[in-house]
Amino acid sequence: MKLWVDADACPKVIRETIVRAAERTGVECTFVANHVVPVPKRANIHSLQVPAGFDIADNEIVRRVEPNDLVITSDIPLADEVITKGALALSSRGELYTKDTIKARLNIRDFMETMRSSGIQTGGPAALSQTERREFANHLDRILAKR
């Protein structure tokens, strides 16, 4: 199992949790972003900078991901693509996306996108709560323990 992080929008506190888990378990971890993501100098932790552009980082993750890898992302379409390839997808809020739940999440995302494009203010996501941070760390630990 390898860990792939969609680091463009990953909160710093979640990146720190991921780094600690990678250091503790030795799992190979790559942060993919269109900007420099500082990571500690460890043999198993990497940063991959891709060119700026729409979905460039997402496409690179999809290209490299393999079955049973874990992708950390809050990007629903990216989660759908990696699940289709046999990987796991975990949001930075601790939600494990599955084949059973991802289509409903895509429908909600598309509905909200339609609302926004028609001028309705939908607001952004709430700030990351302590409960969500804990949920993320717990899910990540459970997944890494099974590898």
Swiss-Prot record:
Q: Cross-referenced InterPro entries, in alphabetical order?
A: UPF0178 (IPR003791)
Under HAMAP family, the record lists:
UPF0178 (MF_00489)
* Family membership: Belongs to the UPF0178 family.
Q: What is this protein called?
A: UPF0178 protein VP2328
Q: Which species is this record about?
A: Vibrio parahaemolyticus serotype O3:K6 (strain RIMD 2210633)
